[in-house]
Amino acid sequence: MLNLCHALRGVRQFSCSVIVKVKCASCSIKLQDQDPSKPGYYTKPKSLPDSKLNPDLQDLKYLLFSQDIQLSKQAIQNDPDLKTKRDLLLRVICKRCSNALHHNNYNPEEFPESTLNDILNYVPRGSNVMHIVPFVEFPLHLDPNVLKRNDLDTTLVLTKSDQVFKDKNAVSKKVPIFMKQFLKNTLRIDSNKTFAISALKNWNISMFYNYFKNYTYLLGNPNVGKSTLINTLLQKYLGYKVKIDSTGKINSPSEEVMQEAFTNPKNFFKIQAAGVSHIPNLTRSVQAYQVGGKILFDLPGYSTSTSRLRLEEPIDERWLQRLRKTDLFNRKHIKQKTYESMKGTSQGGCYTVGGIFYLVPPKGSINQIVKYIPGPSKTFKNIEKGIDVFNSCNSSSGTHPLSRYCGIKSVICEKSQYKRYAIPPFIGSIEIVLKDIGYILLRTTGRYEFKGLHEIWIPRGIQVGIREPLENLIESGYQRYIETNGKESSCPRDRPIISSLYEMAPDEADTLNAVKKSYLEKTEKDLSARRFVDDDPYDLVQHLEKKKNPYWYYQW
């Protein structure tokens, strides 16, 4: 933690010489008032409204004025001492964060993405690392490159588990057993270091705290729950920000600051909290926290794909906030699993949530869909009709009768801006996962009969995958594991349980043979993963009860 007593001692004017020693309370970047084009810039006032105030307090007051978090004039007059200056400094945030957090006004280009190697520059070799992955979007966000590194001691932490399971019993007991066997079977990683948690529901937080070691780094993609986890730990264990100098010395808050933890705990936590936002890449620098007797480092998020689409480009701002704000997730869907029915048609009838994707079932199939993505759903005669309706919604400025169903911007105005994916054959239920968006459960009903492959059309640059329904998979696997005293694996070995999808040409008619061809290409260097390669595809899909999940293959 910055030693504010030292920073403010003898200061006659509030200037860059002081503010450079202060980090943005939101993104942890060092603050500066010299160059608006550089990170950490804050806006200085043009004039001083009250000459009675000391210059340094005036500047502090103005710095916060535009951010709607200034102290009242009475508070400053009654307490014009070092404590007031300290409190003000601790709340300072840069202009970029102020605009984004308080006015929802931000340019995605000001939130640049980082690579894994960029972030690992913050992490010394041999360090303890928690690889943070949102379980709700498993296996997306899981990075084998992190888990396989020999120069790091890595534990897998699965966040947002409350969006998958009804209660924490499965999270505590069943997930670690399943994941140990999944990692061994799928990635050849022998590790029993897995935790499933929910920071919002306080599931497994005490167990997590007891497990993680001193000087641990939280590593993962943007918006996977790192900062939310830190804030839960700060509240539970009276944690706070610290600053560690080049010699390794920990500079903790002053006694005055710590006293506020008891006199005004709400304000204390507000000052110490990690910056949580629906905006990706908000954190720009490493920030250390003292949590109980341990040091924990919050790292900026990293991206694994250079071709990844920024969701701000195609998706409406209000819809995007709903997608990203974890606390808005409605858990009644987990408990009730209310479904919508849809029959596949010869015209290519489709199901969509906001135009973010279009699911096209095969003709004659009867389907049930359980939606775990916020926003109302809508069915259309075909994709072209859906795109046409949403184009009209965008041009009508909200007056179109179907505007409430539109979650995309006018930039996605043609079918050519979507990629067509074929879903490999399945029987029963699957979950379709869209990265940074959420998932839906798709179930075919009635007696099994192959009628064709399901398709999903998604804007270019959005990553998608499928999995067997996760909660049922783990629950049934655990029961099998217990009944056989551990002789049977809780993670199936007879079939893949996750898969990437297969991109199809828009005019491809024989999607099943096209899927097999792509499958053989993808597994060319992974021959051990191949299954049913000698079977005729159309004979194979007649016997899915015995030959489950043909052509399923996940590309890490």
Curated annotation (Swiss-Prot):
Major site of localization recorded for this protein: mitochondrion
InterPro entries xrefs: G_CP_dom, GTP-bd, Mito_lipid_metab_GTPase, P-loop_NTPase
GO cellular component: mitochondrion
Location of this chain's protein in the cell: Mitochondrion
Transit peptide: 1-21
Domain CP-type G: 113-305
GO molecular function, one term: GTP binding
Signal sequence extent: none
Keywords of the record: Mitochondrion, Transit peptide
Pfam families in alphabetical order: MMR_HSR1 (PF01926)
Role summary: Interacts genetically with prohibitins and thus may be involved in the mitochondrial lipid metabolism.
Similarity comment: Belongs to the TRAFAC class YlqF/YawG GTPase family. GEP3 subfamily.
Protein name listed in UniProt: Genetic interactor of prohibitins 3, mitochondrial
Organism: Saccharomyces cerevisiae (strain RM11-1a)
Record gene name: GEP3
